[in-house]
């Protein structure tokens, strides 16, 4: 905080100094402005983020149309947020069965169509944010995945086993060329094109839980606006096939998720909070380097959402980047120290509850975060992507960034044309895209050779441009 004082955490330790002089404040603000400009060149600006989001929304519509009403598909995670390049991370996709509805206790089910299978979500024996699904009524249309995952609870009731459900999908034959990987949480991961493209697919069920969303919407807040709150509520909830780690009922429990709503929330953050989010993800990935998912991108996302909700939006401007990055680091430090971080949508659920964080690792991370807070703006030199961009800044970065972003836009166009089953040899748009991609790669390769680089493999160059 720019108050000149010291900040104490929940254990009473002094954790970070404030900005102590007008000169220091000006330095911080100048560094913040320069860093924001740099990140725009790196592909984190608002226009490229929006273009990515639009491209994946188009794919989502096409995928859902192919399901002919049986399921709704949408992209989640960093791709839906517009924060990663085409090959930079996994494509997270959620596919929600439209023939099943789960409803929380107390909700009337008499008006639900007879074609729909109804499952009652019971949460008394589960950790917050999780539930067990009891069969209330089989619909006239029920998939084999649901039918075969039903089992007896020992009290003459049928419940839906999350373990049986996801295992059925793991054994389901995918598109030709897909390589199925081991289960990760609720997802069934796979790779395509020889491991170049990675996809995490989660099969989920609709959940109607008005009480949870009403409590979330009623919270006093500075952000988001009421219309965004109502949009999040309207998008509803799903349950995914994964129980609380260590629970006696883990194999039959399901986790409540708000992926569609969280997409909307992240996409309505101010530009500065998006950049704080990106930098915190880099800290997680490149500085802390968790080995067992002790801290995840989801952890970081929740920290950013809490900061945004509690902060007057007028304070979230370009010059304050490092102030809010400090706040994010501080919150991350407290979460690691106390092993407590409330889930933004269901505060009763502690995201650090099942964290396998060892004591020595915790102390090391706390020390590292404290050092970063003390370093001020130069902390970003710890981040390899930022450091490489600074070395190339301004002209080489500007030149390369323009071609890299154009290459990504062309790849997203090709992705959407491919989803429409357009042939790359006969479709005019596909031919133009492929021609321009080849031209860009030759331009970049020629400049690399001119500057003394011996690398001239176009396939490797293409891959590196989209990472």
Enumerate the language-model features and the residues they cover:
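Non-catalytic helical "accessory" subdomain of NTase-fold nucleotidyltransferases
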Residues: 1-467
